[in-house]
A protein has these predicted regions:
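Short alpha-helical transmembrane segments in multi-pass integral membrane proteins
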Residues: 54-101, 155-222, 270-329, 385-450, ...
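N-terminal transmembrane alpha-helices
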Residues: 85-117, 121-122, 138-150, 182-186, ...
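Small-residue-rich hydrophobic transmembrane alpha-helices
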Residues: 127-187, 226-245, 359-423, 454-477
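Short runs within selected transmembrane alpha-helices of multi-pass transporters and secretion channels
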Residues: 148, 218-237, 245-253, 278-294, ...
Length: 510
């Protein structure tokens, strides 16, 4: 017995036990020693339980040694020496921007998911039709979002230099130009809608094509409202006000669910409009959001961006327009190439059957939810970089972008790996079709596998755009899109017969 106590004393004299964090382990050791003292001295050496206890005790010692080694490695990193400054950066600059953007994007995507639920109850043909039409709508929304990005950067730079007038003029002119462009675009798409759907849908069934055309013709009417909402929200974010866009877009999407639900399925004795109600509800909701954005800007809720309604009829200042477009056009080319490549891959998928089309659509919806924190951090990096460079703090902009990048990479990888085992459960919220669910599960696991490289292709380019360097990201996007997403996706998915998995492998190569 004395020999065992002395052995325990020698172990406890190890310097590792001097760390305050080891107090819980020391209490465990004391409990073991008390149990040893209470045992029969003669039978102690022959008791199997005593050897089992010492085996666990040695395991505890090994774990503590590993913990000590890890602690020394962490203490030797550059991150540990600057952890206080990173903590201040996270809570004072990243969080106030990223959290409202995250909540806003979450509202948008969750409402999109709920909209998908509403349509999915009409059948998988209806869901496939919405997916095909939305794959084209996303190209247009990507273009509007890119001009919105240019407005955000110019507003952030202008306010960083204390030039409120330039920020207001940039916002006003972006709203005017993009509204007029959206009206023209909606007219053209409405006229050529049938040809567009034939091009996008490929070998889809006639019923799916008819539903996709109906949805497209209804949603193009909302393009002017979508442009106003996106650009107005981007200007407010550039001014550092991320809560107002959150409230407006969150309310807008809740209204979309309520209005669409009533229009699709009816209310009381009214039977509703069926599938037509989905597109009509989205259009009405977007116009309500556009009116709310114009009202917020008119009353000067953010004093830096007070824009009266009559000011929209003033002459345009083309020097500011070209500054916005100098960022927005390369960014829009990148976004349009990205969504166009996605549209082409959708065409690859369109010939693989209705179940694969629906599963691909659902998997993209779930992946977008998983990627929400990274999208929010990417938007925050654009604003933070623009602000810092606006006041000439180049080194600080680099440090902050690097921090946001690693935060996004580690966070998204953890989320993707933790949610992948529940892919089947998430798919069940959308559909009960076993074939569709099988497709979704495979694609979500693939998404988790390649998540560690996502931030390098999303957050870093967002930071470059905040530095008014959108051209480099545009060229990289152009080469990778057509060289990888389209070519590799076609070779693997169509030529080699990998199906939708091959198409997604092309996306990961991109």
């Amino acid at each position: 017995m004395l020999r065992h106590i002395l052995t325990a004393k020698n172990i406890l004299s190890n310097p590792i036990f001097k760390f305050p964090n080891c107090l819980p382990f020391l209490s465990t050791v004391c409990c073991i020693c008390r149990q040893f003292v209470g045992e029969n001295l003669c039978s102690f050496a022959d008791s199997p339980s005593s050897f089992e206890m010492w085996f666990h005790f040695l395991q505890l010692r090994s774990a503590l040694n590993i913990s000590s080694a890890l602690r020394q490695v962490v203490h030797g990193t550059r991150w540990h020496s600057k952890r206080k400054s990173y903590k201040v950066l996270f809570w004072r600059e990243i969080t106030p921007l990223a959290v409202p953007i995250f909540m806003e994007n979450a509202c948008v995507l969750l409402m999109g998911v709920l909209s998908t639920f509403l349509v999915s109850w009409l059948g998988k043909d209806a869901m496939a039709g919405v997916g095909l039409a939305d794959s084209f709508n996303m190209v247009i929304m990507a273009f509007f979002a890119a001009i919105d990005l240019g407005t955000t950067v110019v507003v952030a730079f202008s306010l960083g230099k204390r030039d409120r007038r330039r920020a207001r003029v940039a916002t006003r002119q972006s709203l005017v130009i993009m509204t007029l462009f959206a009206v023209l675009l909606a007219t053209l798409i409405h006229h050529f809608g049938e040809q567009i759907i034939d091009f996008v849908a490929g070998d889809a069934t006639t019923e799916v094509k008819a539903l996709a055309l109906t949805y497209l013709e209804l949603t193009v009417l909302s393009y002017p409202a979508a442009a106003i909402t996106l650009i107005g929200s981007g200007a407010l974010r550039g001014a550092g006000n991320t809560k107002i866009p959150l409230l407006i877009n969150g309310s807008l999407n809740i209204l979309n669910i309520i209005i669409s639900g009533i229009l699709i399925y009816g209310l009381f004795s009214w039977p509703g409009l069926g599938f037509v109600g989905a597109g009509l509800g989205l259009t009405i909701s977007r116009y309500i959001g556009a009116v709310a954005i114009l009202w917020v800007l008119a009353i000067g809720f953010n004093p830096a961006l007070r824009i009266s309604l009559k000011s929209y009829f003033k002459p345009l200042n083309f020097s500011i327009i070209w500054e916005v477009m100098g960022i927005g056009i390369p960014a829009s080319v990148e976004s349009v190439l990205f969504t166009s490549g996605r549209l082409l891959t959708q065409m690859f998928v369109a010939g693989m059957g209705t179940s694969v089309i629906a599963g691909n659509f659902i998997a993209f919806s779930i992946a977008a939810l998983i990627n929400l924190p990274g999208s929010a951090l990417g938007s925050a990096s654009t604003i933070i970089t623009g602000r810092r460079l606006g006041v000439g703090q180049i080194a600080q902009a680099e440090i902050q972008l690097r921090h946001v990048f690693w935060l996004s990479t580690l966070g998204l990888t953890a989320i993707a790996w933790l949610t992948a085992p529940f892919a089947g459960v998430m798919a069940s919220f959308y559909t009960q079709d076993p074939q569709v669910k099988h497709v979704v599960v495979i694609l979500i696991w693939l998404n988790a596998l390649f998540m560690p490289i996502w931030s390098a292709s999303w957050v870093l380019p967002a930071g470059f755009k905040g530095a008014r360097d959108a051209r480099y990201a545009m060229w990289v996007s152009m080469l990778s899109m057509w060289g990888c997403r389209v070519v590799v996706g076609y070779v693997l998915g169509i030529m080699l017969g990998w199906g939708v998995v091959g198409v997604w492998m092309g996306m990961f190569a991109d």
